[in-house]
Amino acid sequence: MQNSSVLSFLRERAGLQPDDEAFSFTDYEQDWAGVRKTLTWAQLYQRTLNVAHELRRHGSIRDRAVILAPQGLDYIIAFLGAMQAGFIAVPLSVPQAGSHDERVGAVLADTSPSVVLTTSAVADAIAKYVDHSDTDTVPAILEVDSPNLDVENKSNIRLTDAPSTAYLQYTSGSTRLPAGVMVTHRNLMVNFQQLMADYFAPTNGVAPLDLTIVSWLPFYHDMGLVLGVVAPILGGWRSELTSPISFLQRPARWIQAMATSSHPFSAGPNFAFELAARRTSDADIAGLDLGACQGIISGSERIHPATLNRFSDRFARINFRDDMMLPSYGLAEGTVYAASRPKGSSPEVVYFEPAKLSEGTVKRCEARTGAPLLSYGTPKSPIVRIVDSDTCIECPTGRVGEIWLHGDNVAEGYWHKPEETQRTFGGKLANPSPGTPEGPWLRTGDLGFISEDELFIVGRMKDLLIVYGRNHYPEDIESTVQEITGGRVAAISVPVDETEKLVTIIEVKKRGDSDAEAMQKLVAVKNNITAAISKSHGLNVADLVLVPPGSIPTTTSGKVRRTACVEQYRRQQFSRLDG
């Protein structure tokens, strides 16, 4: 695999198994029952070459090609075509019609693309959007589904001086403006080997030949791109894909797609498991069987053990087992994957004393008397160390510190951000332990610890709440509240009379036959939350803000933007349900 890439694997598959189905996409916007479209390996490779030829007419090797297209097979062709042309692909989401997408605008200005790849369905809207963007030059707009890109082209594309960077994965920007992570072709190959070695450890890193990737995750997100596009090519597997909207409209589609696929392997963030468990009816799953499922990765956001339990319990009747659940840790700066418990072992939840965690130390306690945290197993590759971020000295076992990563899956850095690249990707250990490299290390910004040789994660350094001089992790408080409300929560600290106080923003549905009854239920919810936070965390809440679903600002991957929550709270911009 030394000189291999996603493109060389695609070419090989098109030659060896040209007529085998590679990618399928089910479109539920055309028809509620779904319209399924497919591509064989030969079709995919030919269309990729055609897009690459067209791109060469509009730019040069190392130019950027931004992808602004709806989720679908054309998005995959655009992504692969950009890399095939020697361009650096930049996967993004389509801006909402009639609005200015701050993130997309910032990325266009940052990358100065030669070409924007889109589809005929949204080309006019994209052209207008790009015309008003702050770019040095106006990029060409290329429709990937144009008829003339579907003809056979006999000539080859020669990449004599191709860039090492395959694509720019723009971060979701939960704590800052988005930055383009420079993911290389080698990063992809190495990270794929790492995740295979861990997820399929019982079979020596080898998956069943008829494994099917099932995914609705957006292609512009790291997990959606690697799982939905890259992994099927590298593994030679078939894929069953759809859009995030299709999943949100009807979560049962995800379960049904897995149950009707051979040896399905899938992934989703925590909220997806919650939605599927709550909004899938008995009729939806009648006659289905998940017994052949190879695993479902849970990642991208804080994983709540109670959610995984609800999912496992809900679908146990169709032979889903809790050892099929794969809680995983990763980040775009490490391509996508960093650590997970191996397939075949049930998720392990360990309880820790909250007071000790607040002090930065670790002490296990009896079940359900402390803060529940998921184990992410014993990290092997990449190398993981817990480090004191101030002294750059490794923390002893049982001490909370910053998670640092070292390995060939770690990206090159941030696009056109040398200082931030050095700060994040250039970590060096002081007095490293035997066998531990001095550097360079990726400083993840995540807080975690090692207990009994296993990795646990407590939250983001920048999100740490300091209330009355003590550290508290917002995810722990949010988890406590979610057990009561089931909706999205943001725990933030705000200055009140020169002291940091705890405020929680909570999404709930207003229920009741009358306004008086609805208000009575909201008061009961607030009382239950106040008592739970006091009991579990020893904290008084300065303000409980109950808001309608969809009020809390999030990133494109669904993570809560706590900094934005603080700003909205200070400006009194939340619409309170209780007046």
Swiss-Prot record:
GO terms for biological process: Actinobacterium-type cell wall biogenesis; fatty acid biosynthetic process. It comes from the Bacteria. Gene3D superfamilies: 3.30.300.30, N-terminal domain of ligase-like (3.40.50.12780). GO terms for cellular component: plasma membrane. It is an enzyme of class 6 (ligase). Its EC number is 6.2.1.-. The keyword Calcium does not apply. Pfam families: AMP-binding (PF00501), AMP-dom_DIP2-like (PF23024). One of its GO terms (molecular function) is adenylyltransferase activity. Keywords: Fatty acid metabolism, Ligase, Lipid metabolism. Belongs to the ATP-dependent AMP-binding enzyme family. This is Putative fatty-acid--CoA ligase fadD21. It comes from Mycobacterium leprae (strain TN). The lineage of its organism: Bacteria, Bacillati, Actinomycetota, Actinomycetes, Mycobacteriales. The gene is fadD21.
